[in-house]
Amino acid sequence: MEYEICLEPSGIRFMADERQNIVEAAKQHGVAIKYGCASGSCGDCKGTILSGASEQGPFMPLLLLPTERAAGMAILCKLYPRSDLRLHAEVVPKDTWMTEITRLTPLAWNVLELRLRPEWPYPYRTGQYARIAIPGRPDQWRSYSMATPPDTTGELVFHIRELPGGVFSQWLFHTAQRGDALTLGAAQGEFALSPDNDRDMLCIAAGTGLAPIEAMIQESIALGRTRPIHLFYGARKRADFYHLEELARWSRQYPHITITSTLSDMQDASWTGAHRLLPTVAASGHWKDHEVYLCGNPGMIEAAIDLLLSHDVRHDHIHFDAFAPNG
């Protein structure tokens, strides 16, 4: 059965099948509701139910505070209509940028650094991500965080992990060449450095979740800020790591930056560093007065946040970007 969806304040209307979530239905009708992961992990598609009946599907619980739930807020990529609905939802401009691949550099056995040069300046804030259209499939997009803060070169840098069967990552690893064109959507996301405090920073990054964390640390360095930063960077096995030399150079050059690399594979005897699951970092109890930044898979982030909250870290001091496999 289909229902009419009305978005406020834009007044845009479209039909949605009861089996479609709101974001899917909007895309089908050419309506660009702001969203990110499309899997209930990031919270970019928060909206408010103004009237009508709906069913909320599963999402990461911490995305909505109790006060937000009470106010009728919902995660639209997991919201299904059960009657006509009026929703307050952000509709984003359909701005796109044409870019050119300037470099493809292997970082690890399954990670590439992708550098793009946009035809026009591409505005973004450190920590945000861009949506990239899959070549030959203009209706399909993949989201990746920028790995550097905005700079005078204008180049955009991404860390892309190859996923078996991932349409975009397979094209990038096996077909793409320097000079190929890619289309980007406008930058999105609220994951960013808090500008109004000088609290010590705890950063936890898993895999290519290192990208926006690196960008934040680079920005902090460029601004001349010297508040202590402790980065825990985790991977499953040693071969999954990348940028270890660059991170080590930061810790040598800047005394306020501490880097701890840790493996979750306890059987890797060749690794002489730390062996621990990333969420257990949060259990040490030393982070109560820190500003915390996490980026990685939803399971890691949920577990880490639960531990942080249980050790008296304030909810509003925790910032995260959770991403599902994206290839």
Question: Can you say where each PLM-predicted feature lies in the sequence?
Answer:
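Conserved beta-strand elements of the Class I
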Residues: M201-L202, Y293
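Reductase modules of NAD(P)H-dependent flavoproteins
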Residues: M1-L79, D84-L85, P228, F232-G327
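Short, surface-exposed secondary-structure boundary micro-motifs
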Residues: L50-A53, E90-V92, P135, A187
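Ferredoxin-reductase
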Residues: D95-A181, D198-R199, A235-K237, T262-M266
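Histidine-anchored nucleotide/phosphate-binding helix
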Residues: L210, E214-A222
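Short, conserved phosphate/pyrophosphate- and ester-handling motifs at nucleotide-, phospho-/glycolipid
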Residues: G127, G209, N297
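A short, basic/flexible loop-to-alpha-helix module at the beginning of a structural domain
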Residues: A186-D198
